[in-house]
Regions:
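Active-site region of the double-stranded beta-helix
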Residues: 1-12, 24-186, 194-236
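Fe(II)/2-oxoglutarate
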Residues: 170-181, 197-297
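Conserved beta-strand-loop-short alpha-helix elements that form
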Residues: 189
């Protein structure tokens, strides 16, 4: 997707937004037909989809319906007619984590995640021409935007200078680093934390896939440290008197001190940065009931 990764990592990764034009067009892992199919299936449910108009998320009832099953009502199922009507009226359709249900996108995200050693999630955006889905905002991920159909005009600001920022809407995004139109077949890289916004171009319906490369942060470091503190430590749950409570406190402190004395920042960072690679042996028919039946014949 990035061609030779060395120049990209040296000059763009985490530094600047960049439009990539692969010499051989990428095969689209998903298409609008797939979107129509899953909408029509009746099984897609909030929060896997959201409809946004003029920068604001619509109420779920405006694009979903309620299903009655086993004497109960279940809300939040995508209503294809309502969704299509909102898109025709200028709203943006957002589909989250499609790697959960679309096999081609899951394989694509797995390959990218294996190459980068990171967790990769996939989001779809369908935006009418001349319309903006979201105002300027920051994402807690590096993003590769695969423009699959139509085009979008992007405005991307400089990435944060330090770690004191938050994901979400950004009222003061700072100076613009890149303003460009991304066309079908092109890939846009947006560095983690760089505020950005986009408007559907005049080429018709814009359809793009955002591959978000998740990065660990302070929260992950804390969680890993807490996991290690609890690992291999057996303490009484309810000490019965002050003396036992003090002994328990001493054991707890001694355990933590030993762990901290042996743990390095590099080891802690490596623990949260490591993402298991997809298991090739578990792929294909072995993940299906049909494959299971065949294996037992």
């Amino acid at each position: 997707m990035v061609g030779d990764p060395a120049p990209f990592l040296a000059t763009a990764w985490r530094r600047r937004a960049l439009v990539l034009r692969p010499p051989v067009p990428l095969a689209a892992p998903v298409g609008l037909v797939d979107v129509d199919t899953v909408l029509a299936s009746g099984l897609l449910r909030v929060p896997y989809l959201e409809v946004v108009a003029d920068g604001k998320a619509l109420e779920q009832s405006e694009y979903t319906s309620t299903r009655h099953l086993v004497d109960r009502n279940f809300r939040g199922y995508a209503d294809p007619d309502k969704v299509r009507g909102h898109v025709e009226s200028g709203a943006t359709l957002v589909m989250r984590n499609i790697e959960h249900w679309h096999a081609g996108t899951a394989a694509f995200a797995d390959r990218l995640g294996a190459e980068l050693g990171r967790r990769v999630e996939a989001f779809l955006f369908v935006t009418p021409p001349g319309r903006r889905g979201f105002p300027a905002h920051r994402d807690d991920a590096d993003v590769f935007v695969l423009q699959l159909q139509g085009g979008k005009r992007w405005q991307i600001h400089h990435p944060p200078a330090d770690g004191n920022w938050r994901p979400g809407p950004e009222a003061d995004p700072g100076p613009v680093q890149l303003e460009t139109t991304v066309h079908a077949g092109e890939v846009l890289y947006v560095p983690r934390g760089a505020a950005h916004s986009a408007v559907g171009h005049t080429e018709g319906l814009s359809f793009h896939l955002s591959l978000t490369v998740r990065q660990p942060g302070t929260g992950e470091l804390r969680a890993e440290l807490a996991r290690r503190f609890a690992e291999g430590l057996v303490l009484p749950l309810l000490p019965i008197d002050p003396a036992e409570l003090r002994r328990t406190a001493q054991e707890l402190l001694d355990h933590h001190r030993r762990l901290l004395a042996a743990l390095t920042p590099e080891e802690l960072c490596a623990a949260v940065e490591t993402v298991p690679r997809p298991d090739a042996d578990s792929a294909g028919d072995r993940r299906t009931l049909a494959g299971l039946a065949t294996a037992r014949d």
